[in-house]
Amino acid sequence: MNSLANPRMRQFALFTVHCLLLTVLAACGSKSDEQPLIAYAPVNLSLNVTNQQYAALRADNGAVTLPVKGPAGDGGVKGVIVVRQSAGVFLAFERNCPYQPYSACALVSLDRPSRLFMRDSCCNSQFDLKGQITGGPTPRPLKQYSTSLQGSLLNITN
């Protein structure tokens, strides 16, 4: 006789399966959940990539830093770093470091000597020019914003 044919055994088996599923789901948290997320701030920037001020964006892997408030518009929590990946492809990242983002010194900048990566000098987190983690305690990559290029006008929004 099949033991699951007994209604009590079937009920017990279902209860056990549900308990196991709940345990597995509860264990799915990660370390990154322990760090607060970067606060929302409006990002609405427009810049002409042919402007001399943004000359670094004329070459692949060229990058510029934009302030929170400036002639280009609103730039997030602590400003935006714009990186040219290739002709017509730009990436834009929040300068607020994902590691302890409410710390006053949580600020990501281009590495001055090389300009080949970005880093937060406060916590020593490092990121490549695609915003991915390459070192340090940060649990997340850089917050990325949307970009669209229309002619020579680059728009950055969230």
Where are these regions (language model features)?
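Bacterial N-terminal signal peptides that target proteins for export
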Residues: N2-V17
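C-terminal motif of bacterial Sec signal peptides marking the signal peptidase cleavage site
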Residues: V24-A27
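N-terminal pre-ligand scaffold of iron-sulfur
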Residues: K31-P113, K143-N158
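Acidic/polar residues at beta-strand termini and the immediately following turn/coil
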Residues: S46-N48, D120, D128
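Short cysteine-rich clusters marking metal-coordination/redox-active sites
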Residues: C97, R119-D120
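Short Fe-S-cluster ligation motifs
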Residues: C122-N158
